[in-house]
């Protein structure tokens, strides 16, 4: 088991929290992480690229000249691919780039990046974020108290609406719920900030 410091939102230490070594203490597998990132980024592609083939280009319904007797090559349409202004052959069409890797690989990739955050001392565990009124200024102050001044991924429990409202206008903070935690967001953040309740939910899901 690995231990990390548990902080209050004012930055003071509130003891230690024990992490599940099977989730936060494994040897990171970079190959599996790479596969997970490529899969996520592929799923994010819009895939709306399209060109017009000869049937979609406007015009070209009439045969440009008769089949025989002109001495020229036979042509059936001025929208054939060899003509200027003609259709495109084998061009890109709308498609989905999404694919999936095995569930065990996805879980291993997630455990790997979580373990890497612990190794990098970039995991910040907070007992709770609690605000009487959801003000961005107050949340920014809390992050400052926790020495979180760069890009941060904030993992909050589902029912913490005041913290979500207070943090959503911060440009360097992305908020996810425990079930939405993913490899790409963790890798794109400098610090992973998670509440104690959300940490328990993540460990329960990955156990």
Curated annotation (Swiss-Prot):
It comes from the Bacteria. Belongs to the universal ribosomal protein uL4 family. One of its GO terms (molecular function) is structural constituent of ribosome. Transmembrane segments: none annotated. GO terms for cellular component: ribonucleoprotein complex; ribosome. One of its GO terms (biological process) is translation. Part of the 50S ribosomal subunit. HAMAP family: Ribosomal_uL4_B. Residues 45-78 are annotated as: Disordered. This is Large ribosomal subunit protein uL4. Keywords: Ribonucleoprotein, Ribosomal protein, RNA-binding, rRNA-binding. Residues 60-71 have a biased composition (Basic residues). One of the primary rRNA binding proteins, this protein initially binds near the 5'-end of the 23S rRNA. It is important during the early stages of 50S assembly. It makes multiple contacts with different domains of the 23S rRNA in the assembled 50S subunit and ribosome.
């Amino acid at each position: 088991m690995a231990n990390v410091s548990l902080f209050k939102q004012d930055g003071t230490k509130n003891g230690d929290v024990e992490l599940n070594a099977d989730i936060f203490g494994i040897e990171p597998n970079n190959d599996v992480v790479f596969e997970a990132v490529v899969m996520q980024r592929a799923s994010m592609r819009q895939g709306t690229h399209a060109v017009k083939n000869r049937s979609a280009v406007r015009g070209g319904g009439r045969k440009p000249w008769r089949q025989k007797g002109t001495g020229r090559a036979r042509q059936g349409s001025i929208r054939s691919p060899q003509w200027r202004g003609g259709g495109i052959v084998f061009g890109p069409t709308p498609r989905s780039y999404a694919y999936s890797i095995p569930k065990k690989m996805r879980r291993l990739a997630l455990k790997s990046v979580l373990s890497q955050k612990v190794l990098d001392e970039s995991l910040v565990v907070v007992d709770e974020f609690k605000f009487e009124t959801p003000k961005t200024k107050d949340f920014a102050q809390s992050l400052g108290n926790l020495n979180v001044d760069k890009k941060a991924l904030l993992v909050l429990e589902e029912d913490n609406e005041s913290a979500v409202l207070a943090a959503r206008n911060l440009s360097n903070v992305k908020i996810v719920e425990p079930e939405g935690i993913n490899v790409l967001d963790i890798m794109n953040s400098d610090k992973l900030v998670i509440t104690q309740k959300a940490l328990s939910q993540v460990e329960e899901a990955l156990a």
